[in-house]
Amino acid sequence: MPKIMKKVYLLIVLISLSAFSQKTFDNIKSEKLGEERRITIGLPDSYEANPNKKYPVLYLMDGDYLFDPFSGAAKYGNYWDDLPEMIIIGIHQNKDGERYEDTTIDQNAGLQFEKGAEFFEFIGAELIPYIEKKYRTAPFRIIAGHDTTASFINFYLYKEQPLFKAYICLSPELAPKMEVRIPEQIAKIKEPL
């Protein structure tokens, strides 16, 4: 192989490694779910260089297929100074149809139910504390979902003190009574989202 080709090849390899070096995977053993759950973690490009900086966190449902598009959009927004750098946590939910079990609701009550209630608690009681202990996080949390998970994230608005400051709902399939409950609950929240 000519010398120039070796240099080009090495450059491509190094660029590829740096592009993917900030994306890692982890498994969290959940007592609430009674299983391990895989997550993808995306750290901002400046994370290692700025050891005193804290970052907002985006918790992403359907992280196994939404992680890369959201990561790309966040980097693009940051490049143009429209979005701050952020940590992205993608929650995997599509291995064995978990996304439907994770978002189980009682159709009569319109509330999370069975595994849906357990998954709701997993995020608030296990995942968020785990991430906040392991990484430098700012007190600004965002949650995003698509379809059934987009509807599910709105249940966090039902809490007296919502866990998240921002919600990104892509094509939500709203649970029964949700279109009435959300405006009522938002009116009760004293601290701006």
Question: Residue locations for each model-derived region?
Answer:
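N-terminal secretory signal peptides that target proteins for export/translocation
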Residues: 1-5
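Non-catalytic cap/lid and distal C-terminal segments of serine-dependent acyl enzymes
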Residues: 22-193
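Sec-dependent N-terminal signal peptides
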Residues: 7-17
